[in-house]
């Protein structure tokens, strides 16, 4: 099993399935996770009103102890992340350090705000496509381009999470986790 650690950002309005499914699948694979709250609140109210207590507050200085950064979607959550300079700088820092940055649903709009999508091939929720003006958008459930891993929506969250496991650990670990969940995707 892996000894990798992943930081998953959450903010008010984050799509809860895209955060919680990722955390759950990564933990099943033995990959450590840390839910980092963006903003001041001790509890995050997600896009469907589910309240989640982050493990701590997003701190870009602490962020570099992680092997990957995940940006879930959700209109309100991604808006908060696009407006947070420390999130944008953290994304750039992860990439500069050669680390994986993953985003799902509207999450790639945060990557665009950080100025890192130019020349990249990626996907997002189709409703976010009009906002994404750089790079090459493709209509695929999960897309890998170098240090970027992107996915489309809550319905692709399991495939996205398993792709993270494969990238951070191995295809064999991803297969074992998928089998244990009876995932047939």
Provide a role label for each language-model segment.
Residues 1-97, 110-113, 118-119, 131-139, ...:
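Extended, subdomain-level signal for the structured scaffold at the beginning of enzyme domains
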Residues 144:
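Cytochrome P450 catalytic-domain "roof"
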Residues 35-37, 101-105, 120-125:
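Short, hydrophobic beta-strand segments that form beta-sheet elements in well-ordered domains
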């Amino acid at each position: 099993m892996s000894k990798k650690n992943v930081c998953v950002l959450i903010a008010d309005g984050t799509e809860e399935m895209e955060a919680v499914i990722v955390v759950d699948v990564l933990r099943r694979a033995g990959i450590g996770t840390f839910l980092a709250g963006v903003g001041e609140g001790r509890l995050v109210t997600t896009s469907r009103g589910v309240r989640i207590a982050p493990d701590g507050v997003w701190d870009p200085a602490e962020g570099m102890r992680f092997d990957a950064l995940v940006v879930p979607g959700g209109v309100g959550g991604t808006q908060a992340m696009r407006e947070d300079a420390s999130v944008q700088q953290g994304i750039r820092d992860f990439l500069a350090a050669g680390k994986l940055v993953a985003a799902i649903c509207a999450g790639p709009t945060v990557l665009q705000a950080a100025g890192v999508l130019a020349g990249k091939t990626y996907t997002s929720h189709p409703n976010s496509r009009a906002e994404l003006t750089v790079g090459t958008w493709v209509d695929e459930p999960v897309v890998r381009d170098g240090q970027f891993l992107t996915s489309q929506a809550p319905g692709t969250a399991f495939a996205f999470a398993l792709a993270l496991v494969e990238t951070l650990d191995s295809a064999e670990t991803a297969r074992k986790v998928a089998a244990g969940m009876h995932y047939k995707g």
